[in-house]
Amino acid sequence: MASLRDIKSRITSTKKSSQITKAMQMVSAAKLNRAENNAKSFVPYMEKIQEVVAAIATGTSAKHPMLLSRPVKKTGYLVITSDRGLAGPFNSSILRAAYQTIQSRHQSADEYAVIVIGKIGRDFFKKRGIPVISEVTGLGDEVAFADIKELASSTVQMFSDEAFDELYMFYNHFVSAISQEVTEKKLLPLTDISAAATPNKRSASYEFEPSEEEILEVLLPQYAESLIFGALLDSKASEHAARMTAMKSATDNAKELIDSLTLSYNRARQAAITQEITEIVGGAAALE
């Protein structure tokens, strides 16, 4: 049986750990509130640019390369993770899904390219010998589009240059504070953009200046980049929610452990006192 000193030491260290996890839980809750608001506030912009692009794309006979499927020789994967851990299954779930997808779809490394946001994702793929052609790490808790502008632009440009022929995103979609969904989304080509145009929008008459083709040339890359940024905002909210949940679970587990250790301490202390009394009584009896 552990000594009273050992048990008391474990109680003290567990209490200190629970104070840390409780503080992290509260910090994550505050960050989640801001991240959720950021993600929600970006939705109207993304929906509007999608609506405009869809209206133009469905109303013109011109076809932009970003709207057209082509024979797939190489596939790109954009995987969004975090820079820090202590977020439960947040990173492991998304990385497992992306890795298994790549392994099941491709026989050779020449058939795919990986782009990563987040240090944990970068280290995961490099550890497994999977080359990462582009990466962004060190993002703060509140990200701005400028933080990923270069990566987003270069990713879209690589598709235009036929460095790969299709692009998928893997990220955690925020559902609620206790639920996040691993999501795979086909980003390029934008073959389903016409579905975003409502019947009223399709039938509406627009006059474009400059031409529809020139507008699409500018708007389509911006739209694809906005999808990447929107997924990152979604992922940030999911990260803080997952970390808040993980820290709450750790705090609850610490409390249970403290209760159990306290019970063990009291029992051990009672046994020690009983032993001392027995020895005293036995010693007194021996002197009679």
Swiss-Prot record:
According to the lineage, what is the superkingdom?
Bacteria
What the entry lists under SUPFAM superfamilies is as follows:
ATP synthase (F1-ATPase), gamma subunit
Any one GO molecular function term: ATP binding
A Gene Ontology term for the protein's cellular component:
plasma membrane
The subcellular localization recorded is:
Cell membrane
The reply to whether GTP-binding figures as a keyword in the UniProt entry is no
Which keywords appear in this protein's UniProt record, sorted alphabetically?
A: ATP synthesis, Cell membrane, CF(1), Hydrogen ion transport, Ion transport, Membrane, Transport
| Signal peptide (UniProt feature, chain positions) | none
How is it placed in the membrane, per its record? Peripheral membrane protein
One GO term of the biological process aspect: proton motive force-driven plasma membrane ATP synthesis
Q: Name one Pfam family in it.
A: ATP-synt
CDD domains found in the cross-reference section: F1-ATPase_gamma (cd12151)
Q: Read off the NCBIfam families from this record.
A: ATPsyn_F1gamma, PRK05621.2-1
Q: Which family does it belong to?
A: Belongs to the ATPase gamma chain family.
**SUBUNIT field:** F-type ATPases have 2 components, CF(1) - the catalytic core - and CF(0) - the membrane proton channel. CF(1) has five subunits: alpha(3), beta(3), gamma(1), delta(1), epsilon(1). CF(0) has three main subunits: a, b and c.
- Which purpose does this protein serve, as stated in its record? Produces ATP from ADP in the presence of a proton gradient across the membrane. The gamma chain is believed to be important in regulating ATPase activity and the flow of protons through the CF(0) complex.
The protein's name in its UniProt record: ATP synthase gamma chain
